[in-house]
Structure formats: C-alpha cells, structure tokens
Amino acid sequence: AGAPDFAGRMIGAGPQPGDRWNGDPRMADDIKEVLGGMGAEVVPFESRHFGQSYPYGNKIEGLATLPAGEPFIFFDTDTIVTGDIANMPIDFSRPAASMKREGTWPEEELYWPGYTAIWKSLYDKFGLDFESSLDLSQPDEYWERYLYFNAGWFLGADPGAFHAKF
C-alpha cells in the first residue's frame, strides 16, 4: 500500500525449530497473517550454523530462501521504511549496507585481544577471507574498519551468491 510502484516481491524468512534453538523461533501466526495481508510471502528456513547462539547470523542463513540470481534488499524486522522503495536509486551491482552500527560493538576490556583478533577469528572459523573484508580507509582497531552484518538493511545482486560467500 505504501509503495504502489514497487514491482518486486516481499519475502519474510523465519527460522524453524531445531537443535540450534532452545525454544521455538517461528514467527507468530498473527504476524504472518499481517504480512500475508500486505502481499508478503512467508518462507521458513533451517538454522544450520547460527541459531540461538548468534541470532544476527540467521539473516545470512535466511538469504538461502530468496530466489537466486535476482536483486535483493534485506530489511531487519525493526527497520522502518518511510518512503516508496520503488523510487529509491539503487545500484544492485554494488553490495551495500546501512551504516547505523554504533552501540552494538564489544566493549574494550583491560586484557582483551582487540577488534582485529575477534573478527579474524570468526572469519577463520568459517574459512572466509578476512583481509578483503577490511575497510582500509579506517584506522586499525577502529570499529568501522570491520565489515559487520548487523546492519538494518543490506542489498546485492544475488542472495544465493551473498549467502554462499558469508
């Protein structure tokens, strides 16, 4: 209703119960009904890597539910869209993310290893290239230097390729 010129699809992806969750993470039925009433498709996905231990990682896993090879925008459930998204000038060939990341980073402690060690350990755990993820325009150990996936939104040309990479 708020985006009459939008020709895309709205897909709500939700994790399903499994051994990576202590409880039931599914979307409430009334929420699914509201989304459906607005034309959204609600699709389930299995949490294979993250689940309850790192809920923010589930947004990466949810990308596997989206149509491969089609441009996508991911919005967190708490993202407020205030205009018609059909009128946004978007270049899907260049992956992008919101930059509202402050206030969610680890607090420095007396003997902590530092941002580089923390983030590199995560990339190493999943066999990803850490060096290519760094924003070298930012100083070493400054929080904005490190790619972060708790963005309110992110977009790209292919959700399958994005999911496979991360």
Q: For each predicted feature, which ranges?
A:
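Glycosyltransferase catalytic domains, chiefly GT-A lineage
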Residues: A1-F166
